[in-house]
Amino acid sequence: MEDVSDPPFRPLCKVQGCDMMYTEFISSEGLIRDAAKSRQKLDIYEKERPIGIQIFGSEIDSMRKAAEISAASRPDVLDINYGCPVKKVACKGAGAGILQDIPKMVSMTKEIVDAVDLPVTVKTRLGWDDNTKYIVEVAERLQDAGIQAISIHGRTRSQMYKGEADWTLIRAVRENPRMAIPVFGNGDVDTPEKALAYRNEYGVDGIMIGRGSIGNPWIFDQIKHYFATGEHLPQPTVADRVEAARQHLDHSLEWKGLRLGVVEMRRHYANYFRGLSHFKEHRLRLVTEDDPTVLHLSLIHISEPTRPY
């Protein structure tokens, strides 16, 4: 997820039980042009493994070159994003946009598989719209092109994130007797109960969680504990949320520098304190303050209201 699954956030998910993580998706053209922001997204760390680098683009040659550049960072997996529905990506033929040209999608995948000595995986959607839900055939063809796993979001590109994710076609992919690679489901899993129900009902090999982890890195341990015991872990306390936000801020400052670290962290605070009635009195300071020391004190004040600034 762009601006989410970066090095400042990933350690929080790893500590909370995430089994496999991916970088933010990285533009193939940005990598080829050696754009600083794209290159920085290649940063991965030993403590994060296993981890995949995810790339996107619309041109086969550029994607092959980007795959070779990415492979030099030695991720455990190289992932191709054929699922991003955002207009500026999809309408240029990248991300979910390539679902309008399946032969090109297959050719691009084969080029990337042949270009690197890493397992290649794919993240995609059911189709471009309700009339092109060809995911069962597409998954089979991508497997034949050499991918080692596929993650499927249960919506079309046209749906964006509206309505409910439809996992029935994900199950159809899993039940296809020709499919020999792992099939992971994605979409709307934000509780342990949903994770267990979807795994059992749709027979997937695993579950990919995206939006459900934003401001909630605890979801991974919560789900795994529920799978193992049928019981819920305690919900994170206010102090837990403050500590997670503090660590996220510190990691952001370390990786992005003072200015960007402060500014780009602002989008995350509300997610950590969602549902907390007294958060609104702290929000303005968190999204306007530039001094990390004051930000740290502001976070502490959320769990210790009587502590002076």
Predicted feature residues:
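Glycine-rich, positively charged N-terminal anion/phosphate-binding segment
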Residues: 3-76
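Conserved, mostly hydrophobic/aromatic
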Residues: 13, 24, 53, 80, ...
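Hydrophobic faces of well-ordered beta-strands that scaffold small-molecule active sites
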Residues: 21-23, 51-55, 78, 120-124, ...
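Glycine-rich phosphate-binding active-site loops on the catalytic face of alpha/beta enzymes
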Residues: 24-27, 82-84, 154-156, 202-221
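Alpha/beta enzyme core
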Residues: 64-78, 82-94, 103-181
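Single conserved hydrophobic/aromatic residue that forms the stacking wall/gate
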Residues: 300-309
